[in-house]
Amino acid sequence: MMKVLVVVALLVTLISYSSSEGIDDLEADELLSLMANEQTRKECIPKHRECTSNKHGCCRGNFFKYKCQCTTVVTQDGEQTGRCFCGTPPHHKAAELVVGFGKKIFG
């Protein structure tokens, strides 16, 4: 009986040690991933900023990635130019409204 307890204790110790090593490796991988995501966030274009030169570089919002929305602007000289900005499309706004309403109702 004593030998069984010693073997079980040894196995528990080995399993806990190996799982803690795995957790440390996982934390290191997550840290590298978070650092890469942070670098991406710094390079993306925030909401309401101009994205005319980089139409696919908008940042992520709460639920969806912002979309580059373009409009035609008439300058004081009468010249028409296209200007784009990162924003939330109407169908994404509606989805966010429904999700927010659902959270209020269901907790």
Swiss-Prot record:
GO MF, one annotated term: toxin activity
Tissue expression pattern: Expressed by the venom gland.
Keyword vocabulary terms for this entry: Disulfide bond, Knottin, Secreted, Signal, Toxin
Keyword Disulfide bond: yes
Annotated propeptide span(s): 21-41
Family statement drawn from the similarity comment of this UniProt entry: Belongs to the neurotoxin 19 (CSTX) family. 04 (U1-Lctx) subfamily.
Domain of life: Eukaryota
Domain note: The presence of a 'disulfide through disulfide knot' structurally defines this protein as a knottin.
GO CC terms of this entry: extracellular region
InterPro entries listed in its UniProt record: Spider_toxin_CSTX_knottin, Spider_toxin_CSTX_Knottin_CS
Name the UniProt record assigns to this protein: U1-lycotoxin-Ls1r
Pfam families given in the database record: Toxin_35
Disulfide bonds: 44-59, 51-68, 58-86, 70-84
Cellular localisation: Secreted
Signal sequence residues: 1-20
The species this protein was found in: Lycosa singoriensis
